[in-house]
């Protein structure tokens, strides 16, 4: 199972299953995790990227440990709605991951997630050095929270 639409994910998730959020960058992968009720997203660790096989190994170990039912991955669409090279790289990453796992992926528009994460960290008076360490997982948390809010809205209409 490679990718699902958010509506398909809402129908396939069982109560008590957690969802992970990913902010895929060229140097890092920010991770976030939902609670079992899928109401809140919490930033987790940041994976320093090396090569795909190692990145996949670390990500799948995280998924096994946290019992991840699905991944919500930020899709870096341009502000004008067009797709650039980062969108292509994200889709290629998901295609490659689909060969290694049955855990489904959901693409989520990540426009302004890093801006929102940076603003939140600034408001919490996090130092510049700490912001650099935490920005990717904070962005993953914003991406995941957007998807969780949508899932919650879909659940109320089912």
UniProtKB/Swiss-Prot annotation:
Domain of life: Bacteria
MF-aspect GO terms: nuclease activity
Primary residence: cytoplasm
Keyword annotations: Cytoplasm, Hydrolase, Nuclease, Ribosome biogenesis
Statement: the UniProt record of this protein carries the keyword Transmembrane helix: no
Keyword flag Manganese: no
First and last residue of the signal peptide: none
HAMAP family: Nuclease_YqgF (MF_00651)
Similarity-based family: Belongs to the YqgF nuclease family.
Official protein name in the record: Putative pre-16S rRNA nuclease
Organism, as annotated: Allorhizobium ampelinum (strain ATCC BAA-846 / DSM 112012 / S4)
């Amino acid at each position: 199972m490679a990718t699902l639409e958010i509506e398909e994910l809402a129908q396939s998730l069982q109560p008590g299953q957690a969802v992970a959020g990913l902010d895929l960058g060229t140097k890092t992968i920010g991770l976030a995790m939902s609670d079992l009720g899928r109401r809140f997203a919490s930033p987790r660790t940041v994976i320093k990227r090396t090569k795909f096989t190692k990145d996949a190994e670390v990500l799948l170990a995280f998924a096994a440990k946290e019992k991840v039912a699905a991944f919500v991955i930020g899709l870096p669409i341009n502000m004008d709605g067009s797709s650039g090279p980062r969108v292509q790289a994200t889709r290629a990453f998901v295609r490659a991951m689909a060969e290694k796992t049955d855990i489904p992926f959901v693409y989520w528009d990540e426009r302004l997630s890093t801006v929102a994460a940076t603003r939140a960290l600034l408001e919490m008076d996090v130092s510049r050095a700490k912001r650099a360490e935490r920005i990717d997982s904070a962005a993953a948390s914003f991406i995941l929270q957007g998807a969780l809010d949508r899932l919650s809205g879909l659940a109320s209409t089912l």
